Amino acid sequence: MKPRLAFVALALAVATRLAGQTPAARFDSTRLDSVVQYLRSQVDSAFPGAVVAVGDHNRIALLAAVGHYGLDDPRPMTTETVFDLASLTKVIGLTTACILLVDQKKLDLDAPVQRYLPEFRGAGKEKVTIRHLLTHSSGLPAWRPLFRETETREAALALVDTTPLDTVPGARYLYSDLGAIVLTQVVEHITKTRIDQYLDTAVFKPLGMTTTRYLPPVEWRDRIAPTEMDTAFRHRMIRGEVHDENTGRLGGISGHAGLFSTGPDLARFAMWLLNQGSPSSSVLLRSSPSLVKQFTTRQDLPPGSSRALGWDTPSENSSAGSKVSAHAFGHTGFTGTSIWLDPDRDLFIILLTNRVHPTRANTKILKVRPHVADLVVDAVTDQRP
């Protein structure tokens, strides 16, 4: 089967599940219902509303919405609600771009960042590699308030590129938005195009992800879940524009945050990840379907870190819960989003919420995510070790 036709078949499988068919036989429908009931119990406590999507490599077994949009919008959420993905951008967008560029022999994981980005200057930075950036072991600080320190995108990027290292590369794990911003520039230098344009052409359109993008248009606003009252930067309720302040300073476009998407679109993406080695995997990858496994395998850099390349893997007190396999991989987003995939069980778990509405002080999502993951794993009837 030709790659394009193979993916059409995959997309039709998605459409079938979206039409409201009963769950696939390998999922216990009663247990899936318990996932939805649990999420309903968390409405107006952990979040105003949520969308959950569960499935395997070729079908969606559960797609449900609970709750409402927010304080000033009592309309019920729907499965087509658009969410600010926050740091899911790092894996859905930035990491996927890196996978494609490695596949095309345009990006070397162990090459110094300076090979691609000479502007990345400072003591010790010549030793920072692409792998360091992807594993959050570059030595860069976690964050700095670019939205306060600079007035333009260009000035913000220059400040990131010249930020001193805190530690020797590879010596410490520290989750770093700054590292992701540097890696965004690497992708843009290689592709000679802005990352939003590259991802739209190279990833989202080929996968049929029609509601995944940066800078959502005004006409989408009523479908977008509101996030937070921004008291630090823009001084208004944020809806339809990126929640992350630094991404706001960068014009709404960055590899560390900025993407908006829906449950059905992310399910399409998850199915592509779980389909590696099948004809549909070649929709994006030319020669190396094993690259997804490489990027989603724990790197042990530095020793003891749970990080894969871009992705995270299960660890103690992880948002993945306690029942996914050791080969699972996933990520979370500050706004209340998460995605976990378990290739051993042929399973994906997507949870999208706007838990920061109206304030980020609500952290109950930290208990909701692992409980949802455990409930979903319990619903898989053909359990594998």
Annotate each PLM feature.
Residues 6-17:
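Bacterial N-terminal signal peptides
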Residues 25-85, 106-108, 155-158, 162, ...:
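Short, conserved catalytic-motif segment at the N-terminal edge
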Residues 68-70, 123-328:
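Short, surface-exposed loop or secondary-structure junction motifs
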Residues 328, 335-348:
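Short, surface-exposed beta-strand/loop micro-motifs that present aromatic residues
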Residues 356-368:
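A short acidic/glycine-rich loop-to-helix N-cap element
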